[in-house]
């Protein structure tokens, strides 16, 4: 099918333009060019919800789907790896849930890389159960004995995507502003992973995290910043009763803690 204005095209353009605008602001350069990009962004078609299916439209027009279980789910680029689709817009977020559910119900995710992408989608949707189930399917049915992802031929997309999905299940840092990303721990934790630990996981802002959890709640956390920066950590039922020697403030359930390059903070919960 050929059409103007495929959803993925404008989601990629949105991701590119917003990052270039942010870079111009941080570096203090090319202000006129950044303004031109902002004006162009305002003219792009918005993400649309299909009146037929309640899903994210793949095209500018609300076409009838000819292959609802297709392995490609391009209209959700803005959910992952992009960040345009997120919980700040509940209607679009719910439509994204319906989009992936409809694909899977009709046989989607049949290849290794597509199944890995599905893991990433469910992680961003904060659905630990489905993220874990599709990760299990990826490892059991789409992975060779040597751990190569299979399409059936080897495709490294599935290996990289699977690791990305696991990372997103344990830590996310895509929300907030480009210079002030909000870190959330255990956003999509399966019940089977109720007590465990992870080391060396990176977050936007050049932070490195080591943390442990028990019964789905963080118990110990070590954060190292590679540069002068401020950590914004989302607090919820998984991160309560903070104990640390380092100063911090909390506003609207966001912990704010300043770091100098190379500094490490230890926290217990």
Model regions: which residues?
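Non-catalytic C-terminal accessory modules of carbohydrate-active enzymes
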Residues: 129-245, 249-269
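Aromatic (Trp/Tyr) and acidic
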Residues: 3
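Active-site core of glycosidic bond-cleaving carbohydrate-active enzymes
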Residues: 6-175, 182, 196, 219
